[in-house]
Amino acid sequence: MSELRLMAVHAHPDDESSKGAATLARYADEGHRVLVVTLTGGERGEILNPAMDLPDVHGRIAEIRRDEMTKAAEILGVEHTWLGFVDSGLPKGDLPPPLPDDCFARVPLEVSTEALVRVVREFRPHVMTTYDENGGYPHPDHIRCHQVSVAAYEAAGDFCRFPDAGEPWTVSKLYYVHGFLRERMQMLQDEFARHGQRGPFEQWLAYWDPDHDFLTSRVTTRVECSKYFSQRDDALRAHATQIDPNAEFFAAPLAWQERLWPTEEFELARSRIPARPPETELFAGIEP
């Protein structure tokens, strides 16, 4: 099999396991090289698993999250690298406080773009994935991740940009991952009802107007990867500080998910080769 290379760019450790993880596991299993690039260490992330909300964990959160990322990458079968920036945290309140001076979201765009361009030129991916302009949700690091990823995609092949950052490499395609679609959540919620159970997604669905499911309309590419859903879930559980094993994410049985929604969804944002959506592969149209 000819080797193709996929780079998934994420803001924090755990994002790679909740957004497109089964697709990464599938391509790695098929013999392609898959690299996850994590832009920050997640140092300012909250502890979302009550069992991990302990003084010792708080005191070692950066170290623990690095270990969690190592485990998740091993489970998915992917390569991994850190870009080395510091988590910005998620400001809260009607008048949220300013972001910390040392955080990723405040690093000049040229600086963070050059750092990612170095990785792109070294790994030489055919395809990159990242978040859309809204970051998937409005965390400052997710929005910055989008900006940096798009900038690196555009700059990596330009020999005039960042001439000291390695030999230029042109990435063929850039995708946005769309992991949380209302249609999917509604389908699983309805399946709970058919089994006489109260589904866990009622409150989430209440916030979304079913007549304005704009993310679904942006999807161009659906990758069949149901065989790897269990790996996806195991990788997410490896991020024990960030996910409660009893959380809604794991509520729907895998058998339901595999039958009702066996794909992960992406939006082809930029392409330097002819593209004919709808697609079923991120590497569609690419020859190594």
Curated annotation (Swiss-Prot):
Superkingdom field: Bacteria
GO terms for cellular component: cytosol; plasma membrane
UniProt function note: A mycothiol (MSH, N-acetyl-cysteinyl-glucosaminyl-inositol) S-conjugate amidase, it recycles conjugated MSH to the N-acetyl cysteine conjugate and the MSH precursor. Involved in MSH-dependent detoxification of a number of alkylating agents and antibiotics. Activity is specific for the mycothiol moiety. Has a low but measurable deacetylation activity on GlcNAc-Ins (N-acetyl-glucosaminyl-inositol), and thus can also directly contribute to the production of MSH.
GO BP: mycothiol biosynthetic process; mycothiol metabolic process; mycothiol-dependent detoxification; symbiont-mediated perturbation of host innate immune response
Binding locations of Zn(2+): H12, D15, H142
UniProtKB keywords: Hydrolase, Metal-binding, Zinc
Entry-linked Pfam families: PIG-L
Quaternary context: Monomer.
Originating gene: mca
Name the UniProt record assigns to this protein: Mycothiol S-conjugate amidase
